């Protein structure tokens, strides 16, 4: 069985890439291929990032020779590509099979002139996209790249079923808060709804520009019905998800959003933009409710309709858990990843 070196964000990092690798680490395919996770980027200060990148390159020089496949989890960001490039060159020198697993969606169209990205794509043996939608976009936008492509959806760990009737009147948003994640849309929508639903509360889970959006919520008079918790993990995160009645996502750009998969595993009805790879799997009114990008009024209407219809929320909860189990379970993605490695 060919051995695989997995290169990507550090274990200690936040976000979808490290979450994806952590889930892969729990799959049988990880042991079957004697996989090793080499972290290259970490979310710390610049000196710490530099030291971490240098350490990973130093380690790669000594360990890469024992592996047959190097599986890069990456984005077209110049800094990310530069950090991973020494390891990429070592993989080429050692004649290793190279997989470029691109954690990006509609942003791909912004990188067609990125020479560094194009160079990496041409020298890879396989390009992995997060959804069929992004594979189609890639083939259209990068028609001069002849490297084969395939699709691997993100996986999500299953959680025990919980009775939706026991949920609290809470709405979650979980993100690295910035303009792309658009938490202001949820705040604007809630500003029109809070007086109608005084017994409902919004919890904003995550880091990023927290103080900016917290102040925005105060300026809107939402401080009594909106709470910014900061970044949460473990039991605390589980408690929020087990209790939530709705999860909202307002993003403009995503690859394939992990937070939606997580919500489905907990049986949380999702209200979202049709962002990233979600159009591949959206069943409107069954596993999610969608609203147009940037439209706070439409979001308010969708939230109100869902809050008012407890039966629909209960039905969506049950169906979402069944749906994610059938399409995104670790068992399903484990076999898909096994098939990818078997190509070599």
Please place each PLM-identified region on the residue numbering.
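Conserved acidic donor-binding segment of nucleotide-sugar-dependent glycosyltransferases
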Residues: 284-285, 289-296, 305-310
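Aromatic "clamp/platform" in nucleotide-sugar-dependent glycosyltransferases that forms part
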Residues: 252
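A short, well-ordered alpha-helix in the C-terminal region of glycosyltransferases
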Residues: 298, 305, 312-326, 333-339
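Nucleotide-activated donor-binding/catalytic signature segment of Leloir-type glycosyltransferases, i.e.
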Residues: 214-232
């Amino acid at each position: 069985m060919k051995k695989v070196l997995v290169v990507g964000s550090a274990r200690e990092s936040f976000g979808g890439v490290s979450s994806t690798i952590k889930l892969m680490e729990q799959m049988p395919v990880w042991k079957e291929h004697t996989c090793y996770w080499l972290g290259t980027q970490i979310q710390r200060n610049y000196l710490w990032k530099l030291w971490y990148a240098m350490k990973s390159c130093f380690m790669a020089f000594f360990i890469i020779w024992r592996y047959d496949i190097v599986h890069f989890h990456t984005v077209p960001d110049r800094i990310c590509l530069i950090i991973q490039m020494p390891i990429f060159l070592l993989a080429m020198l050692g004649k290793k099979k190279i997989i470029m697993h691109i954690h990006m969606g509609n942003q791909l169209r912004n990188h067609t002139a990125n020479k560094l990205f194009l160079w990496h794509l041409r020298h890879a043996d396989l390009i992995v996209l997060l959804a069929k939608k992004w594979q189609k976009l890639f083939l259209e936008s990068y028609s001069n790249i002849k490297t084969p492509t395939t699709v691997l959806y993100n996986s999500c760990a299953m959680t025990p079923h919980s009775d939706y009737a026991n949920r609290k009147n809470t709405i979650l948003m979980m993100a690295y808060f910035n303009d792309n994640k658009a938490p202001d849309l949820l705040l604007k929508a809630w500003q029109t709804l809070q007086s109608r639903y005084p017994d409902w509360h919004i919890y904003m889970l995550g880091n990023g520009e927290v103080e900016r959006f917290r102040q925005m919520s105060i300026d809107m008079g939402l401080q009594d019905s909106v709470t910014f918790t900061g970044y949460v993990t473990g039991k605390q995160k589980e408690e929020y998800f087990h209790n939530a009645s709705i999860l909202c996502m307002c993003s403009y750009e995503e690859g394939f959003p992990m937070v939606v998969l997580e919500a489905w595993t907990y049986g949380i009805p999702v209200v979202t933009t049709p962002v990233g790879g979600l159009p591949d799997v959206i069943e409107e009114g069954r596993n999610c409710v969608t609203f147009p990008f940037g439209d706070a009024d439409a979001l308010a209407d969708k939230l109100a309709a869902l809050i008012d219809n407890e039966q629909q929320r209960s039905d969506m909860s049950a169906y979402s858990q069944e749906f994610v189990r059938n399409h995104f379970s670790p068992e399903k993605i484990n076999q898909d990843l096994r098939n990818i490695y078997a190509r070599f």
